[in-house]
């Protein structure tokens, strides 16, 4: 066990360091998400600059790179404390990727994937919380912030032994969103569907 856990932490960080947003944009011939839109290499920004297909590919990959290392460690019998560190390592890789000059994203989808192995019931509640918040407010960042705030309480209800690791993960996500929190407070945050609300050209009579 003592040899497996540190190795899984390193593997999780390396998996997290594979920035799907940058790779998908390169393959699709889109601008670098770090230099376009909001400047964040994540699914929401790829949605703004590249559309739904590219954003969906980024979202799925980002979820999987958090899910697979934690699921593998869970199957090997790693304890909750180490599982939490593995989940955090995957998110740290996404936020500060060694393969992309340490310029990464916010870690929301990767954190969601890392939490998913705890149980499908928790996964459904977390996804529902994010979706409901986004539908009501229009802000993807607010959905992430609210989900991070309530995640430890959900986990305490479903699987209390994972509460502390998930709380650490939530703190990391909230810290990463400090700029978004300030923009939300000032009313300067962009809504997720703002790019689709372009005025149609008026027909000439």
Curated annotation (Swiss-Prot):
InterPro entries: G3P_acylTferase_PlsY. It catalyses: an acyl phosphate + sn-glycerol 3-phosphate = a 1-acyl-sn-glycero-3-phosphate + phosphate. It is a multi-pass membrane protein. Pathway: Lipid metabolism; phospholipid metabolism. Keywords: Cell inner membrane, Cell membrane, Lipid biosynthesis, Lipid metabolism, Membrane, Phospholipid biosynthesis, Phospholipid metabolism, Transferase, Transmembrane, Transmembrane helix. One of its GO terms (biological process) is phospholipid biosynthetic process. It comes from the Bacteria. Its EC number is 2.3.1.275. GO terms for molecular function: acyl-phosphate glycerol-3-phosphate acyltransferase activity. The chain crosses the membrane at residues 4-24, 80-100, 112-132, 138-158. Probably interacts with PlsX. Catalyzes the transfer of an acyl group from acyl-phosphate (acyl-PO(4)) to glycerol-3-phosphate (G3P) to form lysophosphatidic acid (LPA). This enzyme utilizes acyl-phosphate as fatty acyl donor, but not acyl-CoA or acyl-ACP. Belongs to the PlsY family. This is Glycerol-3-phosphate acyltransferase. It comes from Cronobacter sakazakii (strain ATCC BAA-894) (Enterobacter sakazakii).
């Amino acid at each position: 066990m003592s040899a497996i856990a540190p190795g899984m932490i390193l593997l999780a960080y390396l998996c997290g360091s594979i920035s799907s947003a940058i790779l998908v944009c390169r393959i699709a011939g889109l601008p670098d998400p770090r230099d376009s839109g909001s400047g964040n290499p994540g699914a929401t920004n790829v949605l703004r600059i590249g559309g739904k297909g590219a954003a969906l590919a980024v979202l799925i990959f980002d979820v999987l790179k958090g899910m697979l290392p934690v699921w593998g460690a869970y199957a090997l019998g790693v304890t909750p404390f180490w599982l939490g560190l593995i989940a955090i390592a995957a998110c740290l890789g996404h936020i500060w990727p060694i393969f992309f000059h340490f310029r990464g994203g916010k870690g929301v989808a990767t954190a969601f994937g890392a939490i998913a192995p705890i149980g499908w019931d928790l996964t459904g509640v977390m996804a529902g919380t994010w979706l409901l918040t986004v539908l009501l407010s229009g802000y993807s960042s607010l959905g992430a912030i609210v989900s991070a705030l309530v995640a430890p309480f959900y986990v305490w209800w479903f699987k209390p032994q994972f509460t502390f690791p998930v709380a650490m993960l939530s703190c990391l996500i909230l810290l990463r969103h400090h700029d978004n929190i300030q923009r939300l407070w000032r009313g300067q945050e962009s809504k997720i569907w703002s790019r689709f609300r372009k005025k149609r050209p008026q027909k000439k009579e």
